[in-house]
Amino acid sequence: MAAVKFLVCSVLLVVLATQSEIGLAQNCSAAIGGLMSCGPYVLPGNQLTPSTQCCSAIQAVNHGCLCETINIISSLPGHCSLPPVSCGTA
């Protein structure tokens, strides 16, 4: 469990460090940092309901910031010479 939390923190730090626009990175940095309260909810196999803190953090994040962050995370395998991740396909 600690290793997964470390991985989540590491990914978030990489995402924040690689934002292409400084203004967006500064605005997203605090908002994305707030998403750490959602950590237990995003782990595979959990049966938890998101906490009030998590829901508040999600509400505070700009839609563009979320999309940009998801795009950056999705590109990580390619930057590590790994095949792309394809969710929902066999």
Swiss-Prot record:
The lineage of its organism: Eukaryota, Viridiplantae, Streptophyta, Embryophyta, Tracheophyta. It comes from Lilium longiflorum. This is Protein LIM3. CDD domains: nsLTP_like. Disulfide bonds join 28-65, 38-54, 55-80, 67-87. It comes from the Eukaryota. It is found in: Secreted. Residues 1-26 form the signal peptide. One of its GO terms (cellular component) is extracellular region. Keywords: Disulfide bond, Secreted, Signal. Belongs to the A9/FIL1 family.
